[in-house]
Amino acid sequence: LKSLGIEFDLFSEEQRLYENGAIDNVLKRLEELSLSYKKDGATWFKTTSLGKEEDKVLVKSTGEPTYRLPDIAYHIDKVHRGFDLIVDIFGADHIDTYPDVLLGLEALGIKTDHIKVIIHQFVTLKKGDEVVKMSTRKANFITLDDLVDQLGVDVVRYFFIMRGANS
């Protein structure tokens, strides 16, 4: 991102949320509020108590958290650090999870009116007339650095700003 002139003042790693107890604190608070329960070896977020049609998994039976849990903890961290505007840019694969994150924050007494969410569609790349199929699981992807190296900063910037996040 730095090659595009985008810099971060602070980069936070998810692991820190586990090490400092933030993840466990979210689970504990939800349990205290009777908003979580165990079923089939998984920990569930009782979103039906908050008006949703079905409950959502926070921790899978394998012990692996879903996106919801660390995202709730991370947003609590951001709020406690005093940010008056939080802008989340998620890929289209997070469209079903971010409403649960906001719901979790609200259930824990945190206002969400200063959190703005942008869902960005995936970028489609073509080689000639063919669409290049991307898959991080199959290690078939092109990094932003690769694009900048192949096309140049100005071309990459142009193509990203010529379309909206929803296209």
Identify the function of each model-found stretch:
Residues 1-29, 37-40, 78-91, 113-121:
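Conserved alpha/beta enzyme-core scaffolds, especially Rossmann-like or related mixed alpha/beta domains
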Residues 6, 12-13, 53, 129, ...:
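Residue-level signal for pocket-adjacent positions within structured domains
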Residues 7-9, 18-19, 46, 58-59, ...:
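Generic, ordered loop/turn and secondary-structure boundary motif
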Residues 14-20, 43-50, 118-126, 163-166:
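A glycine-rich phosphate-binding loop feature that marks nucleotide/adenosyl-phosphate handling sites
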Residues 20-80, 105:
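A contiguous, basic/glycine-rich beta-loop/short-helix subdomain that forms a polymer-engagement track
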Residues 75, 79-167:
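Catalytic adenosine-cofactor/nucleotide-binding cores of aminoacyl-tRNA synthetases and other
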